[in-house]
């Protein structure tokens, strides 16, 4: 018998159990949003003490790291760690974890998120208002200090980097959509069926740019859409000196806005 997929949301967390207090706040934000509704579930892949708390309603999928992944690419890590084990095993298997979560999902919409991302009030109403006609969706992402973080982003627009050397990443205005974008792996929404047909590359681990690889691949098949009615927010303060706050991203954003004003960038 074919599996019956219900209308609703599967929240797919990847976790390492490093800060379960923050993680618990993220889980609570989902329950607060869906209070009285049964069209959602919370799936967690990894290790966490929260999995033992039945009241949280988490469908836990155990996942043990490090993962056996021999590769010559690990040679630098092995030299730095002075450990042969690092040559054969890796931690940070976020692509693998997200793929596992998607396979376990019972609902037709997936919300992929890391264990420090929480829903702001009105998130579910915002998506209800936004509608269901999308394959990959994004909304505003805020850092804990309420500054905008990596959400709606340019990757390689030729108006910014004519040589397409992939160093033109920057935040974009929310009302502009192009075919040169990428989606953050920290948080994004996608349809289950679409994701299962376009899964993450499991050879890519944390820090390998798995979100960029996935974005560049799937943007050939669908248009990313922005939901202006919903917001998520980090429950801990993330890097405030790197992207999107650093000089490169800020400079690229100024170039993007200038090219937009000159008419060199048009929205789809």
Model-derived segments and spans:
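Active-site acidic short loop of glycosyltransferases
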Residues: 6, 105-108, 200
